[in-house]
UniProtKB/Swiss-Prot annotation:
Native source organism of the sequence: Lactobacillus delbrueckii subsp. bulgaricus (strain ATCC BAA-365 / Lb-18)
Subunit structure: Homodimer.
Protein name: tRNA pseudouridine synthase A
Keyword NAD included in the entry's annotation: no
EC number: 5.4.99.12
Binding sites annotated in the UniProt record for substrate: Y113
Gene for this chain: truA
Keywords annotated in UniProt: Isomerase, tRNA processing
Length: 262
């Protein structure tokens, strides 16, 4: 007999070799599975995530699930037991017991990624692991105008890095927001879609920054999307500025879907 637990996890991805377990590497999945193994006195408990973040990518809202053997432990006790053993660069923020038909990956309705990019002339030592860096002038209004071209249903082949295993490249992009944080001299970019291809957000960020810098026309994204060719976009933003912000398991709220008829 097992009980299925759904947990929300925040982590500083700097010192992890990504989410997925890899022999000899420190990973998110491997760290949680090792703690569960200790809690079950040696039993293997498989952890499933909503997605596999790369090395250096952070999370505010990663969601995992696992089936815990033996007697059911109250959710409040489970999160306390796990957090008491986690390293300081990880913390569970929510826990609930769910039905067995819930799956952290296959039940997803949408994902929200946020990217922070510092516009400082030189790399800020206190930001270097938590923001991307773009030391060139950008016109945020141009980036905001360009971002509108991403909304809707598109084939995002041009923004998928090699190495991905998903053949269907069509995604519904519900929401894109580009904002200037003047106090911290950063550009904050938010993306909400039904899902994202391998490195898609980082490639989109790099392309929007090129538009902001005048290296591409404002509406060049339309051409790049239509081309369905990865060679149209050569740059990929650094992993350190990317955050998995939220995972939706109900329909994405209308306030994030604007007037899209999707």
């Amino acid at each position: 007999m097992t009980s299925r637990y759904k947990l929300t996890l925040s982590y500083d991805g700097h010192d992890f070799h990504g989410f997925q377990s890899q022999p000899g590497q420190r990973t998110i999945q491997g760290t949680v599975e090792e703690i569960l193994k200790q809690m079950t006195k040696g039993q293997e408990v498989r952890v499933f995530g909503s997605g596999r973040t790369d090395a250096g990518v952070h999370s505010v809202g990663q969601v995992i699930h696992f089936d815990y053997p033996g007697r059911e432990i109250p959710a409040a006790n489970m999160i306390k037991a796990l957090n008491s053993q986690l390293p300081m660069d990880m913390v569970f923020t929510d826990c609930e017991i769910v039905d067995k038909d819930f799956h952290s990956r296959f039940s997803v309705k949408g994902k929200w990624y946020r990217y922070r990019v510092s516009l400082d002339g030189f790399v800020n030592p206190f930001k270097r692991f938590y923001t991307g860096h773009y030391p060139y002038p950008v016109d945020v209004e141009k980036m905001q105008e360009a971002a509108k071209d991403l909304l809707g249903r598109h084939d995002f082949t041009s923004f998928a890095a090699s190495g991905g295993q998903i053949e269907d490249k069509v995604r519904d992009m519900y929401y894109v927001n580009v904002a200037l944080d003047e106090e911290n001299n950063e550009v904050i970019m938010d993306f909400i879609a039904t899902g994202f291809l391998y490195n898609m957000v980082r490639i989109l960020v790099a392309t929007l920054l090129e538009i902001g810098n005048g290296r591409r026309p404002v509406h060049d994204l339309k051409r790049v999307i239509a081309a369905k060719n990865r060679l149209e976009v050569q740059q990929t933003a650094q992993a350190c500025g990317l955050y998995l912000y939220h995972v939706f398991y109900e329909e994405v709220p209308r306030k994030y879907r604007l007037d899209l008829d999707l």
